Amino acid sequence: MTLDISKYPTLALADKPEDLRLLPKETLTQLCDELRTYLLNSVSQSSGHLASGLGTVELTVALHYVYNTPFDQLVWDVGHQAYPHKILTGRRDRLSTIRQKDGLHPFPWREESEYDTLSVGHSSTSISAALGMAISAKKEGKNRKVVSVIGDGAITAGMAFEAMNHAGDIHNDMLVILNDNEMSISENVGALNNHLAQVLSGSLYTSIREGGKKVLSGVPPIKELVRRTEEHLKGMVVPGTMFEELGFNYIGPVDGHDVNELIKTLKNMRDLKGPQFLHIMTKKGKGYEPAEKDPIGYHGVPKFDPAHSSLPKSTSSKPTFSKIFGDFLCDMAAQDPKLMAITPAMREGSGMVRFSKEYPKQYFDVAIAEQHAVTLATGMAIAGDKPIVAIYSTFLQRGYDQLIHDVAIMDLPVMFAIDRAGLVGADGQTHQGAFDLSFMRCIPNMVIMAPSDENECRQMLYTGHQHTGPSAVRYPRGNGMGTEIQSEFTALEIGKGRIVRESKKAKDGSKVAILSFGTFLESALQTADAIDATVADMRFVKPLDEALIKQLAADHDVLVTIEENAIAGGAGAGVIEFLMQEKLLMPVLNLGLPDKFIAQGTQDELHEELGLDAKGIEKSISDYLAK
């Protein structure tokens, strides 16, 4: 539903940045107010990421006001905070479609707009990309400005510091803006810092500082005195000199909600030479009190009524797989003090809030540091503990070398609880958990499990925790099937599946067996009822139940594998590899995710589109048998 733009008269004048730059400066505060209200009213009707964007309204307006976008390049890290950017770059009337099938992409996306310089979704990539753009801008000699905007969470990742270390070394012109919403700043401190920012970024101070460095460079004691004096001056209000040690000229912190002061500072910094670092303080959820009080809860929101002070609760009586995992952690920790749970900044999403409160000494949030998370688990395992790394499928990609080098080679008892495996829905290409089976299946020593329901998930987590080597349990986003959950733990026999439905002779004379890996089992059973097929819940992707595969191959004419993973290199590919190794030549149909990046949509919409619901599975099998 598109909002009535006549209710936002100043915003109506700023459809694109070139329109924005024509507005008088005295109207920009009103523009920010209208932009924030528009964002709140739109996202509350459509769902999406809210709190981050509410906090970056003034920054977004200031950036597009000062810089000549899209010629000058803005690089947004992750992109949760880029909704105001989308509104101001010609996509205002489509904001209500964001994160929906065929709608606006949830993050900045190059195919969507010339103002989106980098397609993003994972964190901490912006400084590296911006530096690459800055290097090329210098090469082409067109005086193109490049700006990276990164949050205080994303900047903790090693990749961000690697990029800053390189930028400081080669001294290219670029600006990194740290959007720090961890704390609020008082009016006095904010005013003092805003004034200091004007001084430190101004041309007079810059020329004096650079000139003084040249004059005094041959007099080490005086040079050191000047340096220390400058640091003491800045140290009164600047939180440290770490960024300057990396080679950046640090300015800030400044109030990120004063649009006119931001514009002054950005104009001063725009033409400074070398790598610049602007530290701004913002409030996540700014302007909407419930989001200010609960920025985590309002980070990503369903449809809601802004007039109410709370978000609607889920109406499903079925637990999510994330909750199944969280309950397992608490129940298992009560029995095993050696259990250690690690997450790279995904406490809420991974279902670990309760565990973090009940077992704080066994809980470790390492921030956005997937590589460190995996190798931290390595150290714990070497010391005799039983670590569990709770991680989204898409983010495990970032710790792949550590999975091989630091865990699997040493055959250490580290379990990976892989959430959001398969299609996650609204977050699109960057977040679909499409590849974990493919990239883990080739690793020696790994045990890989794919539960068909929530009870099987619980027992597989226990199985992995008891295993003496590396293991992984991968499960999807969302609710379970409503299966009864047994409270007691039962370890599964590793590498053993089960037949859950036996077929009789099919109507066309061909006997079909469906080998289901994961939560498609319910759809497989619906299909089997329609075509009279055998169904096996394979449970283990590695090691495969080779005896069961041999049995199914001997008793059936066609095998069908189904998984919520890329077909290339996935579980079905493993079945074919085994059959070929045993010289068991027979027709095998692999169903799963196609060889393309899957865009956003609801999980049900995507399953239907890809032919992975019961109706689509039946059609694929019928078409295959008809060949």
Swiss-Prot record:
> Entry cofactor note text?
Binds 1 Mg(2+) ion per subunit.
Q: In which pathway does it act?
A: Metabolic intermediate biosynthesis; 1-deoxy-D-xylulose 5-phosphate biosynthesis; 1-deoxy-D-xylulose 5-phosphate from D-glyceraldehyde 3-phosphate and pyruvate: step 1/1
Which SMART domains did the record assign?
Transket_pyr (SM00861)
Question: What stretches pass through the bilayer?
Answer: none
Catalytic activity line of the entry = D-glyceraldehyde 3-phosphate + pyruvate + H(+) = 1-deoxy-D-xylulose 5-phosphate + CO2
The subunit structure is: Homodimer.
Annotated function: Catalyzes the acyloin condensation reaction between C atoms 2 and 3 of pyruvate and glyceraldehyde 3-phosphate to yield 1-deoxy-D-xylulose-5-phosphate (DXP).
Q: What is this protein called?
A: 1-deoxy-D-xylulose-5-phosphate synthase
Read off the lineage from the record. Bacteria, Pseudomonadati, Pseudomonadota, Gammaproteobacteria, Vibrionales
Gene designation per UniProt? dxs
